[in-house]
From Swiss-Prot:
InterPro entries: DUF697, UPF0283. Residues 27-36 have a biased composition (Basic and acidic residues). GO terms for cellular component: plasma membrane. The keyword Ion transport does not apply. The chain crosses the membrane at residues 78-98, 109-129. Keywords: Cell inner membrane, Cell membrane, Membrane, Transmembrane, Transmembrane helix. Its main location: membrane. Belongs to the UPF0283 family. It is found in: Cell inner membrane. This is UPF0283 membrane protein BMEI0952. It is a multi-pass membrane protein. Residues 1-36 are annotated as: Disordered.
Amino acid sequence: MSDKTPRKPTAFRLEQPARVSAASEQEEPRRPRAVKDLEQITPQADVFDLTDDEAAELEILDPAFEAPERKGWSLSRILFGALGILVSFAIGIWTEDLIRALFARADWLGWTALGVAMVALAAFAAIILRELVALRRLASVQHLRKDAADAAERDDMAAARKAVDALRSIAAGIPETAKGRQLLDSLTDDIIDGRDLIRLAETEILRPLDREARTLVLNASKRVSIVTAISPRALVDIGYVIFESARLIRRLSQLYGGRPGTLGFIKFARRVIAHLAVTGTIAMGDSVMQQLVGHGLASRLSAKLGEGVVNGLMTARIGIAAMDVVRPFPFNAEKRPGIGDFIGDLARLNSDRNARK
């Protein structure tokens, strides 16, 4: 044991100067009081934004469209078919007479002409075969569109799976759809309602293509709008609108996996023109025209720039019509683009150009 005596218990006070000083220096809460002369910030209205009524009016002017199926032979088809047969006979007889005449003059000339004719015939047959394959692909896309709409309407799971498999086959060579196709592959053994499967395939596979298609339509509309604003002649405007519209239709068909040939492109163009003829002209409603050339933009856009906006909107309508025709599935889960999606960008583009002048 230790010899030291234990210390007696004593009381002592703990000093906490930091807490005491912090508590003493704490400010008293401010008493509530009324504040006058509040600064109000009023957002400036954008003259390029459409109201709900104007947007609804544009949607009415550009409804969705399904081309009716043609049955039987029309008089125009019979006429052009008969003329085509006559022209083929004429070319064949002319070629035969030419080869006979060359054989009569010199054998080597006749054999050379015959070889050239055979090469031309083989190339022509290859072109016809390629066009027939492209037309068959186009017809399959149109049938797929109808089958997908029927499967979604009837909620038929078997028909929906068949339509989705066809869509995956069409999109197999499109890199943007790889992620969506992998997702659908993982759901092969799952039980999904037919309508939900159609909507899922549209969302996962066609959504990236729809975004790219909107970009293509917007860029084409901007180019037409700018060329119209700077071109000195109306004939140049018309020519460029036709050129840009044809290129837009072909690029949209290639984007969605159509890959049309020459005849397929002509058929696409005819269906797009039929779309525009059925859904109405490019004429705007009263409220939209007032916004374009009246109250909102009259002080911002010159007459030439206003024409650029209208031509750009016409190109946008052609692009939307082309999307309706070449898209494998109808718009169901995704929102169908309308004129209102492009009018603001076109008006701002021309307004900025006018401001820089």
